[in-house]
């Protein structure tokens, strides 16, 4: 799950990388955090789309049961 602390840390590492640079450990941490963040966003979008298509499909089937 994406927490505020995760977002804060991603932002902190990003700004530090632009100002003074990151250690190898920080670069690895930044990579892992970004990977986890992107993975969760993708899963969230997939769930939303699955729900959307399920709703659209469900609605579509109902339209055939009566005359418009």
Curated annotation (Swiss-Prot):
Q: Which SUPFAM superfamilies match?
A: YnzC-like (SSF158221)
Q: Which GO cellular component term is one of those annotated? A: cytoplasm
Asked whether the UniProt record includes Chaperone among its keywords, one would answer: no
Q: What family is reported? A: Belongs to the UPF0291 family.
What species does this protein belong to? Caldanaerobacter subterraneus subsp. tengcongensis (strain DSM 15242 / JCM 11007 / NBRC 100824 / MB4) (Thermoanaerobacter tengcongensis)
Q: Where in the cell is it found?
A: Cytoplasm
Q: What highest taxon heads this organism's lineage?
A: Bacteria
Q: Which Pfam families would you find in this protein's record?
A: DUF896 (PF05979)
Identify the keywords attached in UniProt to this record, alphabetized: Cytoplasm
Question: In its UniProt entry, what is this protein called?
Answer: UPF0291 protein TTE2340
